Amino acid sequence: MITVVDLYHVLTAVVPLYVAMTLAYASVRWWRIFSPDQCSGINRFVALFAVPLLSFHFISTNNPFAMNLRFLAADTLQKLIVLALLALWCRLSARGSLDWLITLFSLSTLPNTLVMGIPLLKGMYAAAGAAAGADSGSLMVQIVVLQCIIWYTLMLFLFEYRGARLLVMEQFPDTAASIVSFRVDSDVVSLAGGGGGAAELQAEAEVGDDGKMRVTVRKSTSSRSEAACSHGTQSHSQSMQPRVSNLSGVEIYSLQSSRNPTPRGSSFNHAEFFNIVGNGKHGDEEKGAAGGGGHSPQPVVGKRKDLHMFVWSSSASPVSERAAAAAAAGAVHVFGGGGADHGDAKGAQAYDEYSFGNKNEKDGPTLSKLGSNSTAQLRPKDDGEGRAAAMPPASVMTRLILIMVWRKLIRNPNTYSSLLGVIWSLVSYRWGIEMPAIIARSISILSDAGLGMAMFSLGLFMALQPRIIACGNSLASYAMAVRFLVGPAVMAAASIAVGLRGVLLHIAIVQAALPQGIVPFVFAKEYNVHPNILSTAVIFGMLIALPITLVYYILLGL
């Protein structure tokens, strides 16, 4: 039976996180302490140092030889069940698509375990778990390890597979089956392209004597010339050569859609920004925000042209300076921008009515646009005679996707922190080696700030968004149902199937009811696959997560 003391322990663990988030929100919305440029600096620190070091701290201090394999099996089975059901739906239903498979998989299986899960589950089940021989904090760390190393990598694989399909369909609609190899230039880090999506990539085919094609993928001439124009607007002290970045972190994006080069930071009007933030009306007044059909959102003119927002970026573009003039809504990237469509006039601020199906546009049957801000894309269903569009051999596509996923992973600091944490924990617990005190203290002084800074950063993100519910009420309700009902239900079934009972079963179910993870939203933003839905799931889900998890906690404790 849950007592008042138990609830107090839970609130003691979780309320401080919401205090940090609320302070950040108030600092921007009400008190006007931070400008968007300052927010980007805070979040750059969080993305580069605080969160990776926090991950390293938790993973490196977790005993890998005492992992609960049955608990991990339940978590893995849940994700495999959801993935299999979604794949079957896409295969058998005309309303299914790869975009929706990715989005629904993210919503139902990838919670915010690192930031919310560890403190919340410790507060709920620290005593009961210890009595049952299950450390709830350690179990959450084990889930974090699998998320960082396996499931986020799988997400990247699916996103790059989607990008590869679109690239091949658009540029080789009739000859794709003849492709025997791909070579990708080193400055291309994603098949999603840059601000214009796959349109910013060009593929050059070389036909051999055997009739087979060998394709080279590089940035398009127009995107390179845009980059040159962007460099021309910079200070003479800056180099004209592209600067390669292997960092990952935060970017600032303008709410206005524009394809004109924008000098970095020079056009921002802080007074107007605070004016806009103060009145709280900018989300509803945004022209084109709810545009339907095939209409593009109209550019917003007037005082609101300088309002910016930021997203967390899990990977960086190889040309960080170029991003200042990308088609990504007049973006100002504070460091290595992601290669995504962050505000393209083809639908970055528009969303369709609540529907899973693709709608035929008046321009023709081959142009279809997924609901909720997914990239408008050419998706030929057949070749005009009812046959599916041909694709290159599976081995060729797999090699191409693996190359792109590898380029993403090596630019993500969380990849290094997770792997180094696993390696050190294996060495430390196998041979009893302790980390030198100087190194341990150097890490802990930053990792100790990780939880608070991560929540503070999330509060800044919420304050800079035009609307909390960005995808419409219907889609938001559906996303919350998937996040807080479907995910825990499938986890309960998977846990029972592998034999979890008692406290372990309760921990597994509550863990599945945590708010939406940040990283899936970052990926959705970079690849422009329903980013409004994931944004709503992160922001609104965080607001309602505490009462929902408390309800699960109380019901399971009856």
Curated annotation (Swiss-Prot):
Subcellular location: Membrane
Region (Disordered): 214-243, 277-298, 356-390
Extracellular side: 1-6, 60-68, 122-138, 440-442, 501-502
Chain ranges passing through the membrane: 7-27, 39-59, 69-89, 101-121, 139-159, 419-439, 443-463, 480-500, 503-523, 538-558
Record GO cellular component, one term: cell periphery
Top-level taxonomic group: Eukaryota
Principal location class: membrane
Binding site for (indol-3-yl)acetate: V51, N112, L114, Y152, I518, V519
GO molecular function, one term: identical protein binding
Tissue: Expressed in roots and shoot apex.
Residue spans, topological domain Cytoplasmic: 28-38, 90-100, 160-418, 464-479, 524-537
Keywords: Auxin signaling pathway, Membrane, Transmembrane, Transmembrane helix, Transport
Listed Polar residues bias regions: 231-243
GO BP annotation list: auxin export across the plasma membrane; auxin polar transport; auxin-activated signaling pathway
Entry membrane topology: Multi-pass membrane protein
Subunit: Homodimer.
PANTHER family the record matches: AUXIN EFFLUX CARRIER COMPONENT 1B-RELATED (PTHR31752:SF66)
Family classification: Belongs to the auxin efflux carrier (TC 2.A.69.1) family.
Function as written in the Swiss-Prot or TrEMBL entry: May act as a component of the auxin efflux carrier.
Protein name: Probable auxin efflux carrier component 1d
Provenance organism: Oryza sativa subsp. japonica
Name of encoding gene: PIN1D
